[in-house]
């Protein structure tokens, strides 16, 4: 099957926002208007197409990035009348699922940032915005829920400027707000758009309402000034008072959006069907095609030299696997974005990260959780492959004769863990395999066995994250499990620099064991993890034993010296040592490395670290004092407060250990009228009295 649309007519977009900005409803409307849906699903009825997991339908939130494809022909704009393909990734808004947002942004060419006209910029909007900045993703902003009481378009625009540090430029302004929201003024064409009251999908063009003429003129001048600043020809025309055509405005706006110097802002009410078609026109007009993105960079795994791939079908095949999912019917699905070349179903690809070759059985284009078979996929496409067993998130798939490794994806470490125990013997047999499958799908989910207790521990990004995964165990894998209390993922590090000798000697008849190392330990800056440096001079330890010393140190770091938690941010230099011609072995040096590290760590002022969370609470004013008092009582450090959308917000840094069960406390304290968001910020030293309690607990556990 040949390519359906030219590459410059493809848009790979994400829809990003915080919870309750109307993201899933907006996606539903897009699918309806582009002809992919014949009946619209409502989130609050649990019938939305893109939310296809049971847990999503129940909770009314989006957990996994469902991918879908559709076609749109703009009615207005520089591309009017030309058919385009839009691949959409619907991303979750809950902070526990930030990894889903992160990995979808990595493979997108543009995004629609949704904001609630009442709430404006919520905490999660800031998180997602930072992630989009990190990948340089061009955005348009869509201020949704204009029909809600308290809707304020201009306040939302102001919040985008002030809280996100962006340069929002409205290209529409609303006609009416709240129940009176009837449509908008198109500032480029200077026309009014009024929607049918019953059916929002029909509208008529009218002259700008008399009472809005001055305001529309002011905002058009604002838009013209913003685009003129970025183009000398336009600036000259503007200063001379010459007419500027619609095409000229759109062309400069497009360039400014692509380099993220302007964020065009639109408005609407997806629920009431108002504004979605014009937002789709803006997606085509202002967001990037794979051609605009230009070359993708990587390196040749054989020579390590940098190489590039042009976004063309004629180039060698290169794609990034950005998501692994388990499908009840076809098994493991690997979602990938094609950057160059063509992939035919049934052909072989090289995983250039592992060096393994695998056959792609079938290629599917996903529509939420329904699928369509494709014979081939082309540069710029987003699709799913069946049959790839060894591929992990972030791996590069490419032509085996022209290997390339694309930039990998980096994911945050989990901060919370719980013990899970199978309820029956049958569950026990399935538990390990089921957890392994879930860990394969989600890079921020870890599974390990506690060596002391034999318990299975699962770790993730938050309570909701783990709750959903345990729920999936039950529903998808039919595994019943008992779940323990959430535990904090504490860490240990050192504050001092020391040198220490580690010696392992066994020489009592027969072949002995001998290994002696001298190590220097020093602290690394936060987040650097672990660094090993070989400073051996004059062959004091033969080269072949040095990796064993490193392995022994890393083994010892898993079980810290303060309270047995993993150690981090430590630099270890191997500076001297001794070996024995006959008795030395890899094992002897591994044990010596471990002994040396433990001894050095005890002398290097070791400390316990705990995860600190960035918390934001939004509450009615009458509960503000209670909320702040409660946060302070949780060892929280208040960082700021203010007013937003008629409510008060409080920002604080609070240890994760103090936040368990917070949602229940907050609900009862505010009669359910407050809400909060929380995300991992950093690790910080635990106060001495709490560290001592934790040590006693661990020691008590060990001696039982």
Curated annotation (Swiss-Prot):
It holds the Pfam family EFG_III. It comes from Chlorobaculum parvum (strain DSM 263 / NCIMB 8327) (Chlorobium vibrioforme subsp. thiosulfatophilum). The gene is fusA. Residues 8-291 form the tr-type G domain. It is found in: Cytoplasm. GO terms for molecular function: GTP binding; GTPase activity; translation elongation factor activity. Gene3D superfamilies: 3.30.230.10, 3.30.70.240, Elongation Factor G (Translational Gtpase), domain 3, P-loop containing nucleotide triphosphate hydrolases, Translation factors. Its main location: cytoplasm. GTP binds at residues 17-24, 90-94, 144-147. Belongs to the TRAFAC class translation factor GTPase superfamily. Classic translation factor GTPase family. EF-G/EF-2 subfamily. This is Elongation factor G. It comes from the Bacteria. Catalyzes the GTP-dependent ribosomal translocation step during translation elongation. During this step, the ribosome changes from the pre-translocational (PRE) to the post-translocational (POST) state as the newly formed A-site-bound peptidyl-tRNA and P-site-bound deacylated tRNA move to the P and E sites, respectively. Catalyzes the coordinated movement of the two tRNA molecules, the mRNA and conformational changes in the ribosome. GO terms for cellular component: cytoplasm. Keywords: Cytoplasm, Elongation factor, GTP-binding, Nucleotide-binding, Protein biosynthesis.
């Amino acid at each position: 099957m040949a390519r359906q649309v030219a590459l410059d007519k493809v848009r790979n977009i994400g829809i990003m926002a915080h919870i309750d900005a109307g993201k899933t409803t907006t996606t539903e409307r897009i699918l309806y208007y582009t002809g992919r849906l014949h009946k619209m699903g409502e989130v609050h009825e649990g019938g939305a197409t893109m939310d296809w997991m049971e847990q999503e339908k129940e909770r009314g939130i989006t957990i996994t990035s469902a991918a879908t494809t559709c076609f749109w022909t703009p009615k207005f704009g520089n591309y009017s009348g030309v058919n385009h393909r839009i691949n959409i990734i619907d991303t979750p808004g809950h902070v526990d699922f930030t990894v889903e947002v992160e990995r979808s942004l990595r493979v997108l060419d543009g995004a629609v940032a949704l904001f609630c006209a009442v709430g404006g910029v919520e905490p999660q909007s800031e998180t997602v915005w930072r992630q989009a900045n990190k990948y340089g993703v061009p955005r348009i902003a869509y201020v949704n829920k204009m029909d809600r009481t308290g809707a304020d378009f201009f306040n939302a625009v102001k919040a985008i400027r002030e809280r996100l540090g962006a340069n929002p430029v409205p290209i529409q302004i609303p006609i009416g707000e709240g129940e009176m929201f009837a449509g908008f003024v198109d500032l480029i064409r200077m026309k009014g758009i009024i929607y049918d009251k019953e059916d929002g999908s029909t509208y008529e063009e009218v002259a700008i309402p008399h009472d809005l003429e001055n305001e529309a003129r002011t905002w058009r001048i604002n838009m013209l000034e913003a685009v003129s600043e970025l183009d000398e020809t336009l600036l000259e025309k503007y200063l001379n008072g010459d007419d500027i055509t619609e095409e000229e405005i759109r062309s400069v706006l497009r360039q400014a959006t692509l380099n993220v110097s302007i964020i065009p802002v639109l408005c609407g009410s997806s629920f009431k069907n108002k504004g979605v078609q014009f937002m789709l026109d803006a997606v085509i007009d202002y967001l990037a095609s794979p051609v605009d993105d230009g070359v993708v960079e990587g390196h040749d795994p054989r020579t390590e030299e940098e190489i590039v791939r042009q976004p063309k079908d004629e180039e060698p095949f290169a794609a990034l696997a950005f998501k692994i999912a388990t499908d009840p019917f076809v098994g493991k699905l690997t979602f990938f974005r094609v950057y160059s070349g063509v992939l035919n179903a049934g052909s072989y690809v090289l995983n250039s990260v592992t060096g393994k070759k695998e056959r792609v059985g079938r290629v599917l284009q996903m529509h939420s959780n329904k699928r369509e078979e494709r014979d081939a996929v082309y540069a710029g496409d987003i699709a799913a492959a069946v049959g790839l067993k060894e591929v992990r998130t972030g791996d590069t798939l490419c032509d085996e004769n022209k290997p390339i490794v694309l930039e990998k994806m980096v994911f945050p470490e989990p901060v919370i863990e719980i013990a899970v125990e199978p309820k029956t013997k049958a569950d026990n047999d399935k538990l390990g395999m089921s957890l392994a499958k879930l860990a394969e799908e989600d890079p921020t989910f870890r599974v390990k066995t506690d060596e002391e207790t034999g318990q299975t521990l699962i770790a993730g990004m938050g309570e909701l994250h783990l709750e959903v995964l345990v729920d999936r165990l039950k529903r998808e894998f039919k595994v019943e499990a008992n779940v323990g209390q959430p535990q904090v993922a504490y860490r240990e590090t050192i504050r001092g620099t020391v040198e220490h000798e580690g010696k392992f000697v066994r020489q009592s008849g027969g072949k002995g064991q001998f290994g002696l190392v001298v190590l220097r330990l020093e602290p690394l800056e936060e987040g650097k993890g672990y660094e090993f440096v070989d400073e051996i001079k004059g062959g004091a330890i033969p080269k072949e034993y040095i990796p064993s010393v490193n392995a022994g140190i890393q083994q010892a770091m898993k079980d810290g010296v303060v309270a047995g938690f993993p150690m981090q941010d430590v630099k270890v230099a191997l500076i001297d040592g001794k070996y024995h011609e006959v008795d030395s072995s890899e094992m002897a040096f591994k044990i010596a490395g471990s002994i040396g590290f433990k001894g050095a760590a005890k002398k290097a002022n070791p400390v316990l670290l705990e995860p600190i969370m960035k918390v934001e609470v939004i509450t009615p004013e009458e509960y503000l004092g209670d909320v702040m008092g409660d946060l302070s009582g949780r060892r929280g450090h208040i960082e700021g407060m203010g007013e937003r959308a008629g409510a008060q917000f409080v920002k604080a840094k609070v240890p994760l250990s103090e936040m368990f069960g917070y949602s229940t406390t907050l609900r009862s304290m505010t009669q359910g009228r407050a809400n909060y968001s929380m995300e991992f910020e950093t690790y910080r030293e635990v106060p001495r009295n709490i560290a001592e309690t934790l040590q006693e607990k661990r020691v008590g556990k060990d001696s039982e």
